Amino acid sequence: LAQFPNKARIVIVGVGGIVGASVAHHLLARGWDNVVGIDKSGVPTDVGSTAHASDFCYATSHDFLSCWTTLYSIDFYEKLGHYARIGGIEVARVGDEARMEEIRRKVTSGKAFGTRARLMTPAEIKEKFPLIEEDKVQGGLWDPDAGLVVPRSQAVAGELIDKAEATGKFASFANTPAQSLIVESGRIKGVVTPRGRILCDHVVVCAGLWGRLIAEMAGEDLPVMPIDHPLTFFGPFNEFAGTGKDIGWPLLRDQGNSAYMRDTGDPKTAEGGMIEWGYYEETNPRLCHPRELLEKHQIRLSPSQRDLDMEQILAPLERAIELTPILGELGYDERRSFNGLLQVTSDGGPSMGESQKVRGLWYAVAIWVKDAPGMGKLIADWMTDGRTEIDHAKIDYARFYPHQLEEAFIEGRCREAAQKVYNPAVHPREPYATGRNVRRSPFHQRERELGGYFMELGGWERAHGYAANEHLLAKYGDRIPVRENEWDNRHFWRVSNAEQLAMSEDCGVVNLSHFAIIDVEGPDHLALLEWVCVARIGGDANIGKGIYTHFLDEAGMVRADLTVFRLADRCRIVDGADAGPRDYHYLKRVAANKGFDVTITDVSEKIVTVGVWGPNARSKLQTVVKDADGLSPANFPFAAIKPIEIAGKTVSAFRISYVGEQGWELHMAYEDGLAVWDALRSTGAIAVGIETYANTRRMEKSLRLQNADLLTEYNLLEADLARPKVKDADFCGKASHLRYRERAHQPAILCTLEMTNNVDSHGVPRFPVGSLPVMDPQTGETLVDALGRRSFTTSIAYGPSVGKNIALAYLPWERAQVGRELHVEYFGETFPVVVAAVGYKALYDPENLKPRS
């Protein structure tokens, strides 16, 4: 056994699982050396989820990043000789129309994100999976790339560790738990183990079920929780005796019953001669905190394999027997069956990336077998390059607000996630029921009195529309289609479209309290912002202005989209709620890396913002401000920031518009917000829900949203947001940005599409939500640009002012011409679209005259 080292560049905690082993492999592939892996038990693990995982991979989901990591992982396993690409089936039972629709939606997502899933008939299902009762299913999905990691992901982890050790650049140590972390001045310095201390520059936590306990050593928490996942075995099943196969027939998912099943191949293989049936509890999932996990000497099988009571699964098992009677014919192997612990997360994404509190401490936690090599690659690239080849906003641990890392919040959200692992289908606009009313505007009670239809973002309760405005439907109803399809109409309120139309005729007040607001001050505050921002921030001419700008990553791709208020003594960043935490932590890290003397403070809960917009915004606002003439166009130019007084309160007014109308953003102290809201409402301005601001009018104005339309997979010119000139000062990503500008044209450009016919085959007008593939009308193939990036809608909404379904999508340069006809697919049906605008060009008020009026 190698001597335990006292120094390393990187220590991987939890190296015995498939995630830790994958991280080790990819770090070495990126040129790292002197890497040490430790594990609380065996290497490969005999106690973690990897030790009991079902090890199957389905390629298709509704999330691009998940499809990418799974497809990468499948290829990775296959190149190692450890993947049986046997295919996977998903079925919809007769009578379960919701599941059949979900299967159609999933096939469509596959076309968008690059999987080969297709629909299949009951006869095809029976042919591929003879154990099924054909008359019980109405159809299904065939995923040809689905399959099984063979013989086990546990064995693959062991092989990866052996190969890593053979390089001489890596050493692993079993039965070596991390007892504490050594942290000095906010930076990781090492790990304490029973074998001694090991000093290091970086620690990567891949401890799976125990990940939260390691994070606790750094004074933080991870929003993940282990849940019981019943895994049952029936046998003996000798169909594949003598074949040597680890699996004979395709995988089967019966997600309407929240279950799956598969054979385990030849009885002579390690797990063989059985039928495995697994289930995810929908109504009463059993979660546990990692502190409740037992040690392996305290439990029959292992800490991640808890005893299973047959009563827990009797009802779904009876339904499974109806579909596949063999489960009732074979013997139930109680000794081999168990509750396997796996992890769910508070928002569907794992905890990846650098700690919020400790520099050099990294997490890769809550990752399933199907994604492990892909996530291992992302972490290695992230640590090496500071970026990944696909946008990682959805998995970045920096995305979480402090309240989202509190134990009660984590348990509530994880319980909701556990109830929806397989069923029911999760809507793109699905709200959470727990963790609500955490952050509310100072005029929240007024919004409740108006009958606000609330959703939540970043903890803020946001009304998407107001019941009190439904009288407007009498006036505007003929311009606002009724959404007959329940899925299209779910979590949408028709009144919000009426509010938009009313605002554009008169004036509306919009609650923008969800803004993430960050103050940057100190001697080097301008130096910091000049480095991270594409736009010029310094110079006396910018004082008193709001500067719309972007952060780029090291490769010149779009990392952030925000506004900087240049104040006399500091800068104030106004950001979206979704992107705010990541941008806050990014600023702090850059400042530390560069040695800038700055103070960066999140003041989101101290400042409240209200938008007042419409053709009568100025005249209405003039009735409640102390100095009415101060709002005249001559005295208050576009993009200026000036103090005004409303209801005796000092308000910082920013003349800008995200809704394409004349008006201002009004920023004030939180405690002054109610008085200002009441004063604005006293003018007769209607309350307008956030739907208009965040979706419908934003789309009509061709305005881009970070983490949806703006991603680190595309550059600023492809988003058509590059400034006419590049500033003299250096900034992050500048060299790459200059290279992109030298191209004759970009590989892709963000375009606006209009649906020219939205009526489906049943005669029902559709109003799509989610990501739709953009396809060639002749071939039906999804468009792919010169860099291999696929075209799908990044935002989509019905625009009541233009009277059309409109979407944003990156199109290959050669397809990006106004008037070009293309197709999109929605729930398996094809709809025609036309390119209405190439690049940043609004459909509503294309000359942008209204905001400047």
Please annotate each region the language model reported:
Residues P303-H427, P431-G435:
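C-terminal catalytic lobe of FAD-dependent flavoproteins
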Residues L28-S49:
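Glycine-rich FAD pyrophosphate-binding loop
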Residues E220, F237-G360:
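Active-site lid/adjacent beta-loop-alpha segment flanking the redox-cofactor pocket in flavoenzymes
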Residues Y401-S853:
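Glycine/proline-enriched, intrinsically flexible loops and inter-domain linkers
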